[in-house]
Amino acid sequence: MKNKLIAKSLLTIAAIGITTTTIASTADASEGYGPREKKPVSINHNIVEYNDGTFKYQSRPKFNSTPKYIKFKHDYNILEFNDGTFEYGARPQFNKPAAKTDATIKKEQKLIQAQNLVREFEKTHTVSAHRKAQKAVNLVSFEYKVKKMVLQERIDNVLKQGLVR
């Protein structure tokens, strides 16, 4: 009876000891994964400058053959790799407005001319103005499809009224 009691008490003490050590070890491990105090600000000739004013020289040994992959992306476009080195990331892409070529300028001029001729046809209601306006609308590029349809509808509305001299 005494042996069973001693065995049970030893087992409970061992179980309590194991649980306390695991809780303590997980608490220590969780401290490393929180927000970092040091964040890299700039990199110049393999020297990393941190936000607290400290510097660190970084080098990747030649014999280190493990593949590099991005572990963390910091501010200022700085990447941290799995081997502890830092590098600037790819430059962000900015879409610059394309310079207008001569062809696009000519297409825009044809559209403006067609708009003016349709406006003139709406005022005068003459056959010659209709022919000029219709020809100009037909020459408008397919890139201005919606505007071309609007101009054609304006011509059709004037023709529906009748009264073309």
UniProtKB/Swiss-Prot annotation:
InterPro entries: Efb_C_sf (IPR036233), Extracellular_fibrinogen-bd_C (IPR021033), Sbi_C3_db_domIV (IPR041909). The keyword Signal applies. It comes from the Bacteria. Its main location: secreted. GO terms for cellular component: extracellular space. It is found in: Secreted. Residues 1-29 form the signal peptide. GO terms for molecular function: complement binding. Keywords: Secreted, Signal, Virulence. Extracellular fibrinogen-binding protein that plays an important role in virulence. By interacting with the alpha chain of fibrinogen and its derivative fibrin, enhances a non-functional interaction between fibrinogen and platelets and is responsible for repression of fibrinogen-dependent platelet aggregation. In addition, assembles a fibrinogen protective shield around the bacteria which results in impaired phagocytic clearance by the host. Interacts with host fibrinogen alpha chain/FGA. Interacts with host complement protein C3. This is Fibrinogen-binding protein. It comes from Staphylococcus aureus (strain Mu50 / ATCC 700699).
